[in-house]
Amino acid sequence: MREVVLDTETTGLSPKNGDRLVEIGCVELENHVPTGEVFHCYINPERDMPAEAEAVHGLTAEFLADKPVFSEVASSFLEFVGSSPLVIHNSAFDLGFLNSELEALGKCNIPNSQAIDTVSLARSKYPGAPASLDALCRRFSIDNSRRSKHGALLDAELLAEVYLELRGGKQPGLGLTEGKAIKSNPEIELHSAKRPPRAHSPTKEELIAHSALVKKLQNPLWNRQG
């Protein structure tokens, strides 16, 4: 099953107040495992960058000045996500911004039903525990040392690892689909437990029971002729 992990960065907290998207990052999953296919773009928000937002993601107005506006990336973004379920951490926030941008272009909204909210998943699985991305990385021992600031693609990559754990953890060998190799697929090692040697000879009762069982066998292998 194809899913897309998605994250965005913005100029603020509310598109209703004029805030805009500045970065989109997506990671493709197949059976909850990253395939290596990603979508990533920076976006010129056509407005200033508040200091509070810049402190979160480090993206400056100068850096974004020569980047494409949303209308130039909308079609390629929609083509990448398609109708696949979207795995999002606090989906109301990201979908709010995405749908605001899509509406401005006269395009259809992404329905809430298409989103899988990992905040809700985490709170359902671990009631009362912190559900931030950093907190979940710590819970699952996922290395987030690169995350000195927020970044849409980096956060989507981390969320992909968190989502896999929320869905039950890594299962080597699963997630391969015909015609597509999933990266980071470790070899499966099979181990069987060794039984300790029997410390005593069979009893008389056990020998009788074994003899009776053998007599019931129809054409046992050891009685067959070459």
Can you name each region flagged by the protein language model?
Residues 85-88, 97, 101-102, 132-191:
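Acidic, Mg2+-coordinating catalytic module of metal-dependent nucleases/exonucleases
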Residues 117:
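A structured binding-face within diverse protein domains that lines the active/interaction site
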Residues 127, 150-153, 201-204:
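Short, well-ordered coil↔helix boundary/capping segments
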Residues 74, 130-133, 207-210:
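Alpha-helix initiation and N-capping motif
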Residues 165-226:
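Acidic two-metal-ion nuclease catalytic site recognized across multiple nuclease folds
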Residues 1-113, 123-127, 135-149:
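Conserved non-catalytic scaffold segment of RNase H-like nuclease domains
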